[in-house]
Amino acid sequence: LNAGLQYTGSKTPRRSTQGFELTFAVNHLSHFYLIQNLLPSINKSNNSKIIITSSEVHNPMSSGGRVGAKASLGDLLGLVYGAGFEMIDGNQFNADKAYKDSKLCNILFAKELSKRLRKKNLSIPVIAWAPGLVISRDSQGFFRYSRKYNLLGQILFAFFARDLLRIATSNEKAGMLLSDLVCSSKYNKYDFSYYSNKIISPGKFIFEKSTISKEAESEHLSNKLWELSKSLIENQIR
């Protein structure tokens, strides 16, 4: 599962057909809904894995997570209010934070899903991973939706990050990491795990098992996110 919708620079939230803030709807809630429908088939197949693409920006202590607004879901008050919320924590819309929050949701969802599968004695690895900063050379990919808000800024950022500082990776290399996660037996641990593609020097990365943020470790938060996501779907989608 992979969705990285972001509208950096936008001052107002966009909404799904059901009225959900679009970053949350696409990056988290669609994953939750899809997995509920796929689980019966996944349970019947051999050597299944569930892989969810997150980001290091879910962690306020990471290099990307420290820049701008910090990821934090509070007590999920926005979700308690129903479909009309602007931010998960109940505050006013911030496009940068909305993206980071959605990536934190990815981690919490993966962790809670793994716990619930184990309680059912289902041996299915659940992996969350962060590919790192991926910037393509075409008009797609990174910031493709937010270019209209700051085209020059996005072009300059891509040049410095990808070509000058070399802290970004390519679509092809990120795809190879995902392929390895899917195909390699070394990622068959029947538990939740998180892997990150971390930069160690310009142009050089190491893909390794990593720690999640302190907030992502919260069992209370992961369970509450699950139950509220389920409620939103039952009330607004089905």
Identify the residue ranges that each predicted region occupies.
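C-terminal helical subdomain
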Residues: S102, F157-K209, E219-H220
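A catalytic-pocket lid/entrance helix-loop region that shapes and gates access to the active site
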Residues: S146-Y149, K214, L225-W226
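Rossmann-fold NAD(P)H-dependent dehydrogenase/reductase core
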Residues: L1-S146, Q236-R238
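C-terminal functional modules
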Residues: L228-S229, I233
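Short acidic, glycine/proline-rich loop/turn micro-motifs
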Residues: P13, I206-S213
